[in-house]
Structures are given as structure tokens and as C-alpha cells.
Curated annotation (Swiss-Prot):
Protein name per its UniProtKB record: Endoglucanase 6
Protein keywords: Carbohydrate metabolism, Cell wall biogenesis/degradation, Cellulose degradation, Glycoprotein, Glycosidase, Hydrolase, Polysaccharide degradation, Secreted, Signal
Catalytic activity: Endohydrolysis of (1->4)-beta-D-glucosidic linkages in cellulose, lichenin and cereal beta-D-glucans
Disulfide bonds: none
Glycosylation site residues: N554, N564
Amino acid sequence: MEKFAPVAALLLLLLCFPVAFSGHDYGQALSKSLLFFEAQRSGVLPRNQRVTWRSHSGLTDGKSSGVNLVGGYYDAGDNVKFGLPMAFTVTMMAWSVIEYGNQLQANGELGNSIDAIKWGTDYFIKAHPEPNVLYGEVGDGNTDHYCWQRPEEMTTDRKAYRIDPSNPGSDLAGETAAAMAAASIVFRRSNPVYSRLLLTHAYQLFDFADKYRGKYDSSITVAQKYYRSVSGYNDELLWAAAWLYQASNNQFYLDYLGRNGDAMGGTGWSMTEFGWDVKYAGVQTLVAKFLMQGKAGRHAPVFRKYQEKADSFMCSLLGKSSRNIQKTPGGLIFRQRWNNMQFVTSASFLTTVYSDYLTSSRSNLRCAAGNVAPSQLLSFAKSQVDYILGDNPRATSYMVGYGNNFPQRVHHRGSSIVSVKVDRTFVTCRGGYATWFSRKGSDPNLLTGAIVGGPDAYDNFADRRDNYEQTEPATYNNAPLLGVLARLSSGHSGYSQFLPVVPAPVVRRPMPIRRPKVTTPVRASGPVAIVQKITSSWVSKGRTYYRYSTTVINKSSRPLKSLNLSIKNLYGPIWGLSRSGNSFGLPSWMHSLPSGKSLEFVYIHSTTPANVAVSSYTLA
């Protein structure tokens, strides 16, 4: 018996401590991963910018289109601002804060996480100047990729591309609505005014996406080569509805998920991926959460089908399904050669939250091979993160700056060229390729926290700057990892939401919402007529809000060259007009209103309609 004493002592020692996720410093990895977002910032950098080799950039974005589009994030190693992956990035960062805010706070990174989210949502507010207009890209991938320049001095085309009713993009508008709705939950306590503003934009964007349907890359065709919408837009409409329900507790969005789950593929597709294009697995995970929380009501049969598909996705990751996801010999899930790591981090996030959802509801995962304990999902997520951080056949960390063996030649313009703060010598478009891209040496600027594309199907990796499939990072690689790292850093301390779940809706036939009377439905001033109507209403925190659509009609036989409106008793945001002091006029993009045509603008507030009157006008 004595020879087993050391083993017994070791076991006793282990039992004295909670089983922690040892081996890697997840808190350090979390802190580094947030720095990457600061390296990707576009616009005027704040004074507390911690990535000091970066400087201001993209300061005229949107100017040629008459809109301010300064800010936001560069998506990867280039200098283009792509709206669809940027919105997904913000949605996933917000989801991380919603579920793991306590853990982020314990690591001292909650504030930095919220700042990273706001950097994105501030930009989306600018990119959504009217209810049915959304700017979805700044810059052109073709011309941008022709050059290798620092973002601070790029000479490439900065044209802005938008979607509108004539050129729709339901996937882009839907994902942006999801991002705004999720972020509104994050700011609900710390900045309630900003939270309400984000939710207002989310409502508008969802309406736009749902009413004017179409794929965004059919309207913004320059995006097709880089971020083609292969899955279409039905997944984004369901995704946006799920986030709007979580943010507003509005029964309409729960009903939308229930009514459209079958027709839009939410209950039909068993997924093997989740990312910026395909959102079904994320939708299924969220709807399963609503079901576990007892919120499904009459939609429970449909929501159970959503959950079956969520279970199927999780089981395929664990190798316990009839259709399992491919893994490398070293155990990393593998989807494709180009930037495979995006699917690793996003799947790891879903398994992490699903493990906690199941644990909270005292449920098990149902797989074809039998029931599986939720802890196995969390262990799977840990295995993927550990692989990223260095537990792999190459002993390589795929997070730049973490560990001793990480990529040194990242496919990234900003990090591969000496900082403009160190050497202000202008780097020309093609000269950047000759001088900096082709260098064999390490990057002059450390892109701390960046998750690169990662190894191939056989765990092989080539640390070369021209190997963009493996060495290029992306914001949507890092975003899902925030929540996973925060959760793993807490060990087995348990699942604890930072923000309370909204109360479950009362399952009964809702009373009709009383709408205020529009006392002056038609108001005319000479040849200009004004018609106001309520198009929607909702309740938030006990207060009813109304969306007013106001139509200005040119009844004359000549074009309306200029118009000044007086709007009194307006207590909320307004879209569709240009503003100068207390006067409102035609939007900047409209030079005149033709005879017989109309202009619509929208405002939202929680009382009777504003008093809209014509102050002056000029006919051509």
C-alpha cells in the first residue's frame, strides 16, 4: 500500500482545489485578443489607444457620397471596410459580453470589450442615415489588393457602396440589425440612451431587410469576390429576429421565429459550420435557449425542431453524429483551406454557451449515440482553444504574441510596414509590395492578439506573408473567442450572466395597443402636402413607442427645388431629412423633388405626432 501513497497524496491534493483549465493563461490570451481590435480600427483613434504603432486613417470615408463614414473596422489584412463581416464581428462580441460579462469583468477586460463593441456600433449608426439606406462597404477589394500600403496613407479608391429599396441586401441589413440589437443589451445598464438608439436602428434595419428582400452582393457586386453571400438572407432574417426578441422581449419577433422557422430553413438545416455567412447554427442555439427558458409558448413544437438542429450541430462537433465534422490529425476542426480558424472559434463559442444553457436547464445533449453531458461540450471548446494557443503537432501558437512560437510574417498591411510614427517615408501603392510584402524578416509591428487563418487539414503551416490562406487574421476570428476565453479563464466557477434575462412573455392573447390619434392626417401649404401615419408600435420598459411615417408630396406642376420644414414637439430620432439648426430640408442626396413625386421621412417617439409644417419652399 505504501507505494501508492504518493499517488493518493496527489489525488488528495487535486481534490482540494477546483478543477481549473490549467496549461494556458486564458486571461492573458483574452487581453491580447482585445488588442487586435484596436489594431483594426479605422478613423480618428482615441487618446487611450493602446496599439500605438497605428494612427488615424480613412478620414474622408463617405465624403464623396455626402455621408460621414469615418470609423469602423478593417476586416482583415487589407484596408477595406466590409459591412457584413464587421456586423457579425460586433454581434459576436456583444454575445460574449451578454453571456460572460462577469468573467470579462473579473479579468479586467469588460470595459475594453464594451469599447470594442461601441467602435463598431458608432460606425453602423453613421452607415444607417435613413431607415431604408445602409452603407455596406467602403473601399474596393480589387483596387485595395493591388496595393500594399499602410492604412494611414492609402491611396486606393474609398468609394462607399450602399443598399436601399431599389438595391436591397436583406443579409447585410439583417446582420447589422442583429449587431445593433445585441449591442443594445450590452449598453442597457451603462448607457440606456445609447441602448435605446441602437434598438431603434435595429428595428428599422429589420423592417428594411424583411420588406425589401434580396442578397446584398447582388447590389454591392464588388463584394462578391471577397464576401459572397452563399447562404442567402433567410438565416440573417431569423438571426436578426432572435436578437431583436432577446433585446426587446417583443412578441412579434418570437412569433416571426415560430411562423418562419420551417419556410426559412431554421428548422430544416442541420449545420456543420457557423460564421459571417451562415447563421443557422447560431439561430438554432438562441432559439433553443428561449425554449429552455420557457418562453416558446405556442411555438414550442417548432422551437423543439430548432433545438434538434442545434443538438445535431453540437453532436457533429463531438463526433457523435451520423454526419461528423472533419478534424485534422491534431484534433482541430477543419472546414476549408482559407482562414479555417474562423470556423474553429465560432464553433467553440457555440459549444461553450450551449454547454452552459444545458447545464442551467439541467439537460443533456441528445446525440445519435446517446445522451451527452454538457461538460463534454465545454471540454471540446477547451481542446480547440488549447490547439490555437499551442497544444498542436507543431507546438505553434496561432495567436500572434501569445507563447514563444507564433507567426512572425502575418499577411497584414499595417503590421508588415514600419509604423508611420517611426518612418514617415511615403510607401507607394506598388512599392509596398517590393519593399515590405516581399521581406523575409519578421513584421516590424507586432499584431498582438490576432488569430491567423491557421494550419491545413494535416496540421501543416507555412509562416509566409504571401500565404494569405494561413497567415491572414480577421476580426471575425477573434470576436467569438472573447466569450470562450472569458469562460475558460473562470475554470469551473459556473455560468453566470452579466445581464439579467428579459422576463418571459405572458402567453395570452395580447390586448391591442392603443395608438394616439393623428389629428391632422393631411396638412397642405400651397403645392406641398404632408401626410402622417403610424406604421408600427412597441412597448419598452412600460412605455409605448410609435414609428411615424411622414410623406411630403409635391402637388405642383414644377419640381420642388428647395424645402424648409418646421417640426415642433419632436422627442425622438428622425431619418430622411437634412437638418440645419431647427429647420429641416430635402436630404443631401436629393437635389429636387419632381412634380407629383413624394418624399418619406420617419421619426420615432412615445407620444402624439409631431407638428410638421412648411416654412418655405422654392419651385424650379
